[in-house]
């Protein structure tokens, strides 16, 4: 039987349990390698089956206990005791043979006197036994009690396991360690002269030292830092014992008195010998406890203990070393066979621990041989029952395998298994002592070892706890059991895994196994009080419904999380939350509370609502079971502790009797959180219960006090209420995003959300003893074990009572301005309807938000635009709203704008047949790259263009006038440059996930059933009919790649009249396809305004960004466009690319070193031209112009990126290269070309930087440069600031040269801000 067959059999299941219970099976396999190396070829086929037979027949099915370990050590590992050290002094400590294990405790019977309390006056409580003194008894009696007396400690090691060295050797070692102490150099402030001599003149001083080597001898030079400290001491202090050995101007006189003269300290030799004399003198004077080093103990030999190794360990290691066996003529090595055996064992252990964590049952053993007879229990909720191996399968064939390798292997294996804990308790002492020596040398004192420190803390804790509970009160608050949840209710308890932990079988996996978890019960909010809010939503005949109030549920503190993260825990999973409620209202007052645990990081109430409960506050005390089921990363929690705290928020609204005043204390809460910590994201063995039926039985009933009702909870019990109220319908709002989240009592706060969704919560009348179904849940009629943990109920499901609705965006913002737009009756494609200067409109409106922005100095919120143009499904018109942040649209555009140019600016499309497209938001940090400032326009010129994107298929009967409204909405944005949506060099694939590409609008004739295809050439330039050239922001990013592969996210929007309809199917393919192929390949049947995704399919697995090679969009009408008889208009649609999830191997960059050509100056062959060249380069990438030369400005990925973004800044290297004129003679080449940088006005040259000279024959030069200004980034083009950097190129022999070329090598970290397009002009 091989391993594959064996693992699949029932015998393998039992054998796996036995192998793991015994432990150390991997060591057993490694020892059997020795035997199998010498085995005959006939035995190899029986190796696998006999190993398992040995496990099944010989290995004992009980773990090794401490008593057996001590008995084995005393019986087989004992050796001669260490004699007293009288004559021969021990130079090092030694391991004691007792192993540091205390002896067995001896049971001893002792007698103690027990006093009998006297009976109270007037009563006789003495019945049987000893009577008290009041009733004539002795008042006490003797009682025998058996106690365990500890065995005496070992006389040689005092129970530590290590016999210390002799006292005299320890004293010598202490003195030797004192001599080896390393003292740091003095840190005196250095005089500028000393600093100069120790740095700039150091090489001269070393050469001077070699000159006087015949006087100083062959000595080692010291470091400059050491010499400078010695020179500073000599300069400021009097050193009477130093004598200069080098004859100089002053002979052999002493250098002292500290007068600051250079001749006294300049002549100090730069050697360790003479600098140590000065530094040791300084230490003797200023360092307490300093002793001058002596060479008396330099030859002291430090002996070490070495590793802990016993005789049995040596015998096993040395007895079975044999060369690998390999039969003649065969290439199979038996070691490879055993390696595969070990690897299969590791796979088996992974599977076994997964099964063991879910096993809840009993293992029965036979009384005759203590072997496993049967297994009965549940595995993952499924009942299992396994009989004895003899009853399941036949016994494997018998082979005398035991005689092959003898009894010695098994005998020694048992002893080594017993010895292993002792060896682990005594690690290699060499490394430990080296660390102690190192720390003592650095600290200069004794170190408290970790075991002794822990022992001291334990003794202190016992002392404190003994005093604390010595006179404790006997009174105790007894709570109802159903009001408390324990670990046993939520997590698995008393399972097979807990038994393994108790027997220390899996103890070694406690830190290394990624599948283990840590279960904690954390007390969060303890003294929190929920108050009645100010605002009331509605009043009914039965009561008043209040507004929501939010309470942050405190999580574990920063120190606790930091401690858990340091020991290796990565994730914290909040499984359950037990919310204890103490009502502050009179008993049976008809007031109810709807408590919802919400996730504080979502603006959608439906997604944020984790669980809700309906609580009756007429009872004094209640508990609510909540199920957050929320997992968080501890690392991010440590980085943003505030975000971690607000992850769980309690939302409460009240309904009941009227008359409650705002600020009234309603109830107090104490939240207990059941958390499970995981070391990795691997999955692991969770301890959550698969079924909570047992908990429901314990916490439900007529006489119970727990009240649970709501959604996402296990069940609901309604009892003890005198009257059933009808809780009214209301809109549950998400947690507002203002920082920090506090109680909303006392002031109504407006949610600062760009877009939020509320959740409609309806009456609870029909939900007695059942969950409240909501839209995102499925049928909860089955058992809880069949569904997600804790999200199902055993109650019958009924009709849903929750629906969702969009919040009104117009009521949530602050008015900024409004603009009136006229729409002609017969609007044409590209017609400019309006041009709105946003700054001017905001200032002219003089709204309240404008005043706030004037006070703040900048626009601190994004603008949400609402087009009030009434929807019309039959006109077939689409309006483009183009936000031109940097004034890229040319000034000559007045009445019409070509769509090829307009779509490069990523317009927002308002389709009149779709009312959802009438609202959109402009993100200033994303599009502008900065926040708009009211103190001036700066770089940005925010303008909103309104353009008709299509011709009206059905004209209006009259001109339409509508309003465009702007609201300030959302979170407050940071002042200054953007902190997100920044593109940084080198361009990465992450930047492609958020690009907006508006493909050209396309038309399909009525009745046309043919497919339309066009290539995915996203990086090519767009050229209009008038000759204007345009590149989009996406083209700038994609220009850095020759091609891309991955998944494209897009959507299709139909702009034609509702009279014209069709059904389209879209696919990505690289060749012509048929209808049958289209139906079988990946495709999307597109609906209007629905985001779809397709993977790029082409013969090259990628598509080219330039040209038409690669994949193509194939649009096939599954139903050809159709319209009424009198309607002859075409179907108009457009495709918008939202982003690309690129596949890294499929994306090829165009330039690995990020070097791009900027421009070239070509001198015309005209002798009348000036011979002087003066060219000034600004600190911004732009088109260069020079009157006396022909300039070629190159187009490349870097130039397109600078033109299609708002601003850029960063460091680079400018590479200059030039060519000589053919008519120039070498004898005339006597000039140079100068390159120098500066700042400020370049005509004045007030501030100069670097200066480089290049000869005509050198032909190239590289100069570092940085693009930017005092404001940080700069725009492409425009008028340079006076305070910008510049680089000037000058030569008086321009006639020698033919051309001058400049390349830009972009360095990592170069940044781009904002999104735009360019150049939008007609080439000259």
Swiss-Prot record:
Species in which this protein is naturally found: Grapevine chrome mosaic virus
InterPro entries the UniProt entry points to: Nepo_coat (IPR005054), Nepo_coat_C (IPR005305), Nepo_coat_N (IPR005306), Viral_coat (IPR029053)
Single Gene Ontology MF annotation: structural molecule activity
Family indicated by similarity: Belongs to the nepoviruses RNA2 polyprotein family.
Cysteines engaged in disulfide bonds, as pairs: none
Keyword Transferase: no
UniProt keyword annotation of Cell membrane present: no
Single GO BP term: transport of virus in host, cell to cell
Domain of life: Viruses
Localization: Host cell junction, Host plasmodesma
GO cellular component, one term: host cell plasmodesma
This protein's name: RNA2 polyprotein
Miscellaneous notes: Virions are comprised of 60 copies of the coat protein.
PTM comment text: Specific enzymatic cleavages in vivo by the P1 encoded 3C-like protease yield mature proteins.
Xref: Pfam families: Nepo_coat (PF03391), Nepo_coat_C (PF03688), Nepo_coat_N (PF03689)
